[in-house]
Design a protein with these regions (language model features):
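N-terminal juxtadomain amphipathic helix
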Residues: 2-82
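A short glycine-rich, Lys/Arg-flanked "PGG" loop and its adjoining helix->strand segment in the class I
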Residues: 183-198
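Short, glycine-/aromatic-enriched active-site segment of Class I SAM-dependent methyltransferases
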Residues: 32, 201-224, 228-232
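A conserved beta-strand element that flanks and buttresses the S-adenosyl-L-methionine
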Residues: 168-171
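Class I SAM-dependent methyltransferase SAM/SAH-binding core
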Residues: 116-155
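Conserved alpha-helix/loop element of class I SAM-dependent methyltransferases that forms part
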Residues: 85-103
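Conserved class I S-adenosyl-L-methionine
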Residues: 103-113
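Short amphipathic alpha-helix with an adjacent loop that forms part of the alpha/beta core around
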Residues: 155-165
Length: 234
């Protein structure tokens, strides 16, 4: 099928013996929202989950192109959800409590959306940079953050370092699991970090998904669901 990549090997540890554990049939993209009176029909994509019993990572067998998942017209905005905003404020507060002042620190938020998290960093004196491929980047720019309107890649990472230097803090708030090319992501991170860089990853956890039967988190925007063991391999 066009615009789909089929996974046969674990993208974390390269194990070729993946077990099919859940098939939910064909489902539409969760953010493909259509007006009530529109005659357009949502396109559906196969939703089958593969499990790696070596590193304990769950994969979507069929991964949809990122341009379809996160187009310029992407609807989601972080600022519309009070719990999300409160969580961002708590994240920055916890960072300051544990590691001290962030005044003058270079902060990079990957998938910064409308800049809500960057706003919290900026309030506390940080120098704020974001990477955001969707139209939400304009709202972040309006709040005086430096925004790269693109998907994260090695070339984007090199340009960020060229323009600003190595990062002090890098954040992924419910974004790490959205990035399809894991090897490219890790290569990009290696370019962006120095020995003292703090990387913050907020992510749903495979253990909780299994214990609480959170199968509704297996949608196409999450090509992988990670366990603690996944990150040990990464």
């Amino acid at each position: 099928m066009k615009n789909i990549k089929k996974i046969n090997i674990c993208e974390v540890c390269d194990n070729s013996e993946l077990l099919s554990v859940l098939d939910m049939g064909d489902l539409p993209l969760c953010d493909d929202l259509i007006p009530k009176n529109s005659k357009k029909i949502c396109r559906e994509y196969p939703t089958e989950i593969l499990f790696c019993n070596n590193c304990y990572t769950a994969h979507h067998k069929y991964q949809v192109d990122k341009e379809l998942l996160f187009p310029k017209s992407y609807h989601y905005r972080a600022r519309f959800t009070a719990d999300v905003l409160n969580g961002m404020k708590e994240l920055v507060g916890s960072l300051i409590k544990n590691d001290g002042s962030i005044k003058g620190k270079l902060v990079l938020d990957i998938g910064c959306n409308d800049g809500s998290l960057l706003n919290e960093f900026k309030k506390n004196g940080a120098i704020t940079i974001g990477v955001e491929p969707t139209g939400a980047y304009k709202e972040a720019e309006n709040n005086k953050h430096k925004i790269i309107n693109d998907y994260l890649s090695y070339e984007v990472a090199k340009n960020i370092v060229k323009d600003h230097g190595k990062m002090d803090i890098i954040t992924f708030t419910n974004v790490f699991a959205h990035i399809d090319d894991l090897k490219s992501l890790i290569k990009s991170l290696r370019e962006l970090i120095k020995s003292t860089t703090i990387i913050i990853i907020e992510n749903h956890y495979l253990g909780s998904v299994l214990i609480s039967n959170q199968f509704d988190t297996f949608y196409h925007e999450h090509p992988r669901t990670y366990s603690y063991n996944s990150f040990k391999h990464i």
